[in-house]
Amino acid sequence: MSYNTGKESSPVSPLKKRRASWSELWVNHHHLLSSSPLDLAAKFQSLTPPISKSKTLLPDFTLLLPDLILIRVIQKIPNSQRKNLSLVCKRWFRLHGRLVRSFKVSDWEFLSSGRLISRFPNLETVDLVSGCLISPPNLGILVNHRIVSFTVGVGSYQSWSFFEENLLSVELVERGLKALAGGCSNLRKLVVTNTSELGLLNVAEECSRLQELELHKCSDSVLLGIGAFENLQILRLVGNVDGLYNSLVSDIGLMILAQGCKRLVKLELVGCEGGFDGIKEIGECCQMLEELTVCDNKMESGWLGGLRYCENLKTLKLVSCKKIDNDPDESLSCCCPALERLQLEKCQLRDKNTVKALFKMCEAAREIVFQDCWGLDNDIFSLAMAFGRVKLLYLEGCSLLTTSGLESVILHWHELEHLKVVSCKNIKDSEVSPSLSALFSALVELQWRPDTRSHLSSSLTGTGIGEKGGKFFKKT
């Protein structure tokens, strides 16, 4: 046997080490302070244990899935969380872009540079109205209109022509539409402002599936290109809008529209200045038209008479109309035979002759809706007895109508099945007569909330609360 006579180099146990004195600690501390920052960083890095690559670089099993399978998985995730998935990696970013179907452009450069099409190649709905407005970034004032929203700086919105002065030129909009149409052939809906006939033709040539079109700042000359859309079914024209821009859509434009869009199903006219001839032409040419909306009516007197030629019209909506017809034809003897629904929202109904002519034209309606209409008192509402086949009545925000005025009309509607009364403060629970109560009991649907007190009492039904102490002070 051989023995090693040298001392073993085994480490000394920590328990046997001598404790450092205070002076040694003080010297070591000042030695660290006198060292350079690079030396200190090197020392601390040497003390940090190395990170194992096996713990950080895990295999990405999603690489085994083809794009179609991964897209189906992403489609199961709610839309609110899909944007976070696009931040995972470049592949998921690309796949997320393929799933986006609707986009609202706020920066025109994003469209003109081609980034919109490369980022979202499968778009079906594109809104370009905000992008057509030259608006400097990082402005703190947001202007909201019922048609468009945009940002302005302090003191910049000083004239009524601000919006029109800051619109992109027609040429720029044309080039943008051409780029959009070239990359989004599956486009189904387009919203644009300040375009031209050529811009519409560029879109119609590439996007044969387009079904819905919304034209802001529209004019008669723009509508010359509307006939190129063979499958157009929904059209919204925004002409003259107070405070934003002035643009004229007259009978000429409505006639061009009628001749070019014979497959229209829904039509909305905002601030248009047509009249009887234009509405008549639409009724005769657009045989498939089922819904007509007139907003901010600026039409000529007598336009109501043109509705009689809309033989298949089922819904008529009047929204935000200060006037309906200045001089309706007294010989309105015909009506829209197929009309099923009349909806009046935020309209002035103070002219009795106009309301009488409107109700006569729509006497075949089965559903009547009044929302926040001014001037709808008992006298005006009594004209609604012209409707003989009403099944649904919806009243909201009609503060001048009373309980007796409501009762005098609906008791004559023997086919009434649905009644909804909301926020009509002069209709009182205490004024409901026995005959009106009997009518309520026979209805299929009753929504009765004429004021907050009525809403409270109906919500407390069956609880015993609000019954003059009956819940706590019962006789024994």
Curated annotation (Swiss-Prot):
Domain F-box span(s) in chain numbering: 59-111
Highest taxon of source: Eukaryota
Xref: Gene3D superfamilies: Ribonuclease Inhibitor
PANTHER family, per database record: F-BOX DOMAIN-CONTAINING PROTEIN, PARTNER OF PAIRED, ISOFORM B-RELATED
Name of this chain's protein: F-box protein At5g07670
Organism of provenance: Arabidopsis thaliana (Mouse-ear cress)
Organism placement in taxonomy: Eukaryota, Viridiplantae, Streptophyta, Embryophyta, Tracheophyta
